[in-house]
């Protein structure tokens, strides 16, 4: 019998694995990275191996067991949560069922209440002069308000009350509802399970104990060094300048302006800070905040940086190593020239160099890929590249958004080619590293099977991209010939 024990990355895991082996009358084999032909009890953790590697090991084991270690013994609550999710996925066992009772409770809440999300109780985010529920929402809740006023603001209170009663709020939360229309999960699921676990909330009644936000999202400005084709002027000042020159800048356009918010960030309440842009690593306001936080001794909050990974200065490299819990979400939409074409101004060799530096210095890394008409037939290349160069890094897939669905991947001119790419991606190991990658691709594959080519929409996409190519001096056919040569076959 081969038994795989999952726990935290401490000596206690080895001791508990040894006890499991003794109780079953098998040998204790210790830390595992790959099985040999020996029988016995082995152990590992999500800190030692990537999600995909653990799932592959689980397939070879006769039993997979999550050890009964208290949440307080884990280095980070997310590590515990990720382990629970793996056990669920591989139909493993929990040594202590009571330990997952909180997780099961909130799963039931989400399954029975289509409107509930934890974020209005834990998050503070602003867009220009207004507070919004999260980065996925653009509708204001209220005027910008202080952290002290956040808990009792009438706008927030109304939304919280609606959610508790099971009422959906499509005016604020439509992004997640759209995810759930085509998938079995959404960001509201993930965020709720994460934060109820972190804050040890055992029931809906415990929400009343929250008096101040613990999660902050910041988009300081639209200052960015790239002009990504699926992005917009609100997230890149270069795109704003370009569209103005092309006379297609919306009349109601207004850039993000939250630079001064970094100065008023309440570090003492902060459990997590998510920073995006624009490009945070070229914003002096963000670098200034990091310097102040380090000097004030605030180095243990979770810091998540969404970056294009093109610019890691020596100053930033020295500074970021002083923080203890940093995750880099790196935006990549293709491999090599494909990425550089979609994400204009990027240079693949610089991204690779910076990724290797982050990986070598043991930072948490995940890849964020926007799936669009551009890369829908090239998704497998991203996963195959990760298999070869970064086998422990996972991918988060998201659908390209535009008001007129201009970049909808299901409008691709050759859906058979897209289907093949998805199938090849599903055959990789790294597809198991991201918590939702496999599920996202499987759902996408089902959507492909129920869609026909939209000639008019695809022609609109090509017409728009031709204007961009003419303005930028680039050529779609040289980089992505399948979008030209195999159009609507």
Regions found by a protein language model. Give the residues of each.
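Membrane-interface junctions of multi-pass transporters
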Residues: 137-182, 484-488
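Conserved C-terminal portion of the radical SAM core fold
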Residues: 128, 304, 323-329, 349-483
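Local cysteine-cluster metal-coordination motifs and their immediate loop/turn environment
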Residues: 133, 169-181, 223-233
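A short, aliphatic-rich alpha-helical micro-motif
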Residues: 58-59, 267
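Short, basic/aromatic recognition patches
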Residues: 101-118
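Core AdoMet radical
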Residues: 213-223, 234-257, 268-283, 296-313, ...
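Recognition helices and adjacent regulatory flanks at domain boundaries
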Residues: 104, 181-214, 224-226, 245-249, ...
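N-terminal pre-triad scaffold of radical SAM enzymes
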Residues: 116-131, 206-234, 270-274
């Amino acid at each position: 019998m081969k038994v795989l024990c999952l726990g935290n990355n401490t000596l206690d895991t080895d001791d508990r694995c040894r006890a499991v082996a003794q109780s079953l009358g098998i040998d204790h084999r210790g830390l595992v990275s790959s099985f040999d032909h020996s029988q016995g009890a082995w152990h590992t953790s999500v800190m030692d191996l990537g999600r995909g590697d653990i799932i592959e090991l689980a397939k070879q084991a006769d039993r997979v067991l999550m050890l009964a270690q208290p949440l307080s013994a884990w280095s980070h609550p997310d590590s515990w949560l990720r382990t629970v999710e793996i056990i669920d996925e591989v139909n493993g066992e929990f040594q202590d069922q009571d330990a997952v009772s909180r997780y099961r409770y909130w799963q039931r809440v989400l399954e029975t209440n289509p409107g509930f999300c934890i974020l209005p109780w834990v998050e503070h985010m602003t867009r220009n002069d207004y507070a919004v529920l999260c980065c996925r929402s653009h509708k204001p809740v209220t005027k910008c308000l202080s952290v002290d006023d956040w808990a009792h603001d009438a706008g927030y209170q109304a939304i919280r009350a609606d959610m508790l009663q099971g009422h959906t709020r499509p005016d604020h939360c439509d992004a997640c509802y759209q995810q759930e229309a085509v998938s079995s999960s959404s960001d509201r699921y993930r965020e709720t399970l994460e934060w109820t676990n972190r804050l040890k909330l055992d029931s809906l009644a415990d929400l009343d104990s929250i008096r101040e936000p613990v999660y902050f999202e910041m988009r300081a400005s639209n200052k960015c060094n790239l002009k990504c084709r699926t992005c917009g002027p609100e997230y890149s000042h270069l795109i704003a300048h370009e569209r103005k020159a092309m006379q297609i800048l919306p009349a109601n356009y207004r850039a993000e302006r939250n630079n001064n918010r970094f100065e008023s960030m309440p570090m003492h309440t902060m459990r997590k800070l998510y920073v995006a842009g624009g490009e945070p690593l070229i914003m002096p306001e963000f670098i200034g905040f990091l310097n102040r936080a380090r000097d004030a001794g605030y180095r243990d909050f979770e810091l998540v940086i969404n970056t294009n990974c093109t610019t890691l200065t020596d100053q930033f490299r020295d500074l970021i190593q002083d923080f203890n819990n940093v995750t880099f979400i790196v935006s990549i939409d293709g491999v090599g020239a494909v990425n550089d074409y979609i994400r204009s101004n990027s240079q693949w060799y610089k991204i690779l160099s910076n990724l290797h530096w982050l990986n070598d210095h043991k930072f948490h890394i995940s890849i964020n890929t926007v799936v669009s008409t551009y890369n829908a037939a090239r998704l497998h290349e991203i996963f195959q590249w990760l298999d070869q160069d970064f086998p422990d890094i996972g991918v988060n897939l998201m659908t390209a958004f535009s008001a007129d669905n201009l970049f909808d991947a299901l409008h691709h001119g050759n859906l058979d080619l897209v289907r093949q790419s998805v199938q090849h991606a599903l055959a990789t190991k790294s597809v198991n590293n991201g918590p939702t990658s496999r599920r996202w691709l499987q759902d996408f594959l089902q959507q492909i099977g129920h869609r026909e080519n939209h000639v008019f929409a695809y022609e609109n996409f090509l017409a728009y991209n031709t204007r961009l190519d003419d303005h930028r001096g680039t050529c779609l056919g040289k980089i992505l010939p399948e979008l030209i040569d195999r159009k609507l076959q």
